Curated annotation (Swiss-Prot):
Biased composition (Basic and acidic residues): 161-174
Compartments (UniProt record): Cell inner membrane
Function recorded in the entry: NDH-1 shuttles electrons from NADH, via FMN and iron-sulfur (Fe-S) centers, to quinones in the respiratory chain. The immediate electron acceptor for the enzyme in this species is believed to be ubiquinone. Couples the redox reaction to proton translocation (for every two electrons transferred, four hydrogen ions are translocated across the cytoplasmic membrane), and thus conserves the redox energy in a proton gradient.
EC number of the protein: 7.1.1.-
Cofactor: [4Fe-4S] cluster
Region (Disordered): 161-180
Full protein name: NADH-quinone oxidoreductase subunit I
Naturally occurring in which organism (per UniProt): Shewanella oneidensis (strain ATCC 700550 / JCM 31522 / CIP 106686 / LMG 19005 / NCIMB 14063 / MR-1)
Amino acid sequence: MKILRIIQGVGTQLRSLSMVFSHAWHPRETLNYPEEAVYAAPRYRGRIVLTRDPDGDERCVACNLCAVACPVGCISLQKSERDDGRWYPEFFRINFSRCIFCGLCEEACPTTAIQLTPDFEMGEYRRQDLVYEKEDLLISGPGKYPDYNFYRMSGMAIDGKPKGDAENEAKPIDVKSLLP
């Protein structure tokens, strides 16, 4: 009985060693990160940015849907209104030390203002440095959707043009004319 246990123990040890040595000649998966570039998948969800319209205005209309959709509550913003009646965020803050990069804020945004980029290098030594303000998040370009403008697509009046005269917009429909 004792000899059988010894033979079993030696067998398991030899099996373990054979597994280790069989993997010794396989190619390594480890990368020397700063020197070698890491492949990020095309749909990788990384750092969040705020985009601008093709006109240069910020797309965010401070609807607060992103903050409501965020499961960890890392987004906070305050709505304000310009002279022309357009809403904008007075402040927009994301705490990246709490963010789980789930992408729900991007899906909830009706204006495509919030977009996730493949950037993943966000290491900081202090937690306070991971709280990004609106100025840190705004980029100069329109991001993934270069031709999209929320105010044109939604049919809201643009200064100097009545409804129906903007690009990609039809004249308002008179419902009574459709009746038999």
